[in-house]
Amino acid sequence: MEITVTLVPINLRGAEEPERNQRFRLKPLCAAAEVCLAVKCRSPFAKFKVLISVTNFDNKHLQATVCSRHAAVCVVNAPGQREVVFDGFAKPDDEGATVPLVVGPLFAARQAGRCVRAAVDAIQRQQTVLKVFINEAYLQSAWGAVRGLFFSDNNHESDLTSNVGKFISVDPTDVGARGANSSKWVPAINYVTGRQLLTILFIFKFI
């Protein structure tokens, strides 16, 4: 399995500058990893759009749950697709669209929420954390879908929900004002969460 994190610079006019992308590739060797990414910034006002791609996996379907301190989203690869792609969190008023995750030195303070001490600490450390849970995913049968309306005995999903809840510890921020990505998404309602394969904590260190 290979994971690629791409940071797309956004200039002061709000336009993306893909020719200056910073790309990090890794092949996790253990089930739980912590990875520090040194992000080069030209100024304290630097901003980057985060893209995450998971490739080279053996499973037919894979579920990647990406969590910031204020939001989370699960992404499953479509049938025949050998890549799982994260390009942002679900847009509050349109589940078929995503809002980009933007990081940078000053955004680190925003993710600290309303806690003044946490905000000051975030500015001093100039870093942002992002956690990714990767699970197997299975296509749900018609009977399983009906049964799921009345019973819920999926321990893998319960564990994932609990882990996500522990990581998201800050009041949600309003992402509705940000522009949406051009990509279009379809809700994956017929998949079941399988066993957890990998957990990665990304630490974006702005230098």
From Swiss-Prot:
InterPro entries: AcMNPV_Da18
Pfam family, one: AcMNPV_Orf17
Keywords: Early protein
Role noted for this protein: This protein is required for viral late gene expression.
Protein name: Putative early 22.7 kDa protein
Organism for this UniProt entry: Orgyia pseudotsugata multicapsid polyhedrosis virus (OpMNPV)
